[in-house]
């Protein structure tokens, strides 16, 4: 029987860290190895094909930074993790130096997770890649690695989605001291790829099959609707990790341990005027999501 490789395909600022802790710490469904996010597949795709769209130099510089972080196993100061999910974990029993280098290949990726699985298989059901940039992988690239991955793994894909406006507000808080103007700039221009939930779902379904892709609605999952994910993974949950983003408390959110990446992002509260401004101009995102997913979650657009 092949081991299961769980691919989490974002999205950032939608509680991927609490989801990571729920599956990999609190319940021991899967283990991610040396770190949560190495962005290996994104680096591999970008390394093979730098798209020259007028921002080619910027993308190369970004790729260089990702490679440097990969080679030093550095996730960033704001992504401090519990020991069990770091390179110092009792479950990480190899150095991974061949994988954590600037020279990347799909063969190294496969070997890394097969090696890790053999070390954890008595305690965990699967291995996992929780790199948020998996959400940005192109359909063409995923098709190019699909057969090789399926030779060695059963692939399951999850992705967690938060109300688009509230998520974009957290992004704006993180990226600018003036989030009101920043979010209006985003709404009036080209949005980041993470905003297009429908496209993320469609690309992954087209490659891995709808039966192997499970979108999670953040607000619903943390409100208690956990059984659909448990059924998808064929694994019962005994605990759901706390989530700074639910219930949404804005700047008054609790400072839970190991979730600084969440509570540092909402320093200014979303006011009604800004929310309504964004909802009016981003209604197409909600409608596109409905077309792909089948409905707009009741807790969105509030």
Report each predicted region and the residues it spans.
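PAPS-dependent sulfotransferase catalytic core
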Residues: 1-124, 130-131, 208, 235-288
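A generic "structured core" feature
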Residues: 2-12, 17-24, 28-30, 39, ...
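PAPS-dependent sulfotransferase catalytic domain
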Residues: 28-29, 37-38, 46-47, 54-57, ...
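Surface-exposed cleft-lining segments at the edges of enzyme active sites
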Residues: 95-100, 129-135, 180-192, 265-274
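Alpha-helical packing segments of well-folded alpha/beta enzyme cores
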Residues: 105, 109-116, 141, 197-201, ...
């Amino acid at each position: 029987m092949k081991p299961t490789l769980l691919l989490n395909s974002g999205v950032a600022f939608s509680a991927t860290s609490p989801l990571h802790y729920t599956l990999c710490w609190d319940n021991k469904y899967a283990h991610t190895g040396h770190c949560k996010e190495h962005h290996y597949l994104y680096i591999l795709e970008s390394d093979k094909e730098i798209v020259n769209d007028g921002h080619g130099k910027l993308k190369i510089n970004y790729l260089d930074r990702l490679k440097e972080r990969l080679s030093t196993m550095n996730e960033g100061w704001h992504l401090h993790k519990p020991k069990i999910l770091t390179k110092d974990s009792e479950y990480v029993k190899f150095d991974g130096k061949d994988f954590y280098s600037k020279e990347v290949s799909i063969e190294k990726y496969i070997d890394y997770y097969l090696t890790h699985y053999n070390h954890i298989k008595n305690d965990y059901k699967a291995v996992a890649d929780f790199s948020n940039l998996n959400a940005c992988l192109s359909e063409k690239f995923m098709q190019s690695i699909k057969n090789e991955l399926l030779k060695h793994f059963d692939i399951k894909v999850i992705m967690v989605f938060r109300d688009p406006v509230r998520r974009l507000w957290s992004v704006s808080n993180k990226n600018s001291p003036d989030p009101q103007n920043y979010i209006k700039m985003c709404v009036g221009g080209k949005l980041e790829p993470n905003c297009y939930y429908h496209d993320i779902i469609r690309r992954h379904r087209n490659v891995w099959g709808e039966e192997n892709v499970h979108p999670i609605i953040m607000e619903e999952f943390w409100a208690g609707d956990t059984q659909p994910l448990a059924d998808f993974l064929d694994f019962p949950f005994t605990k759901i990790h706390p989530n700074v983003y639910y219930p949404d408390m804005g700047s008054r959110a609790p400072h839970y341990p190991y979730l600084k990446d969440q509570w540092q992002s909402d320093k200014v509260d979303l006011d009604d005027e800004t929310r309504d401004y964004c909802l009016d101009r981003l209604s197409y995102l909600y409608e596109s999501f409905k077309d792909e997913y089948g409905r707009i979650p009741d807790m969105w657009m509030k």
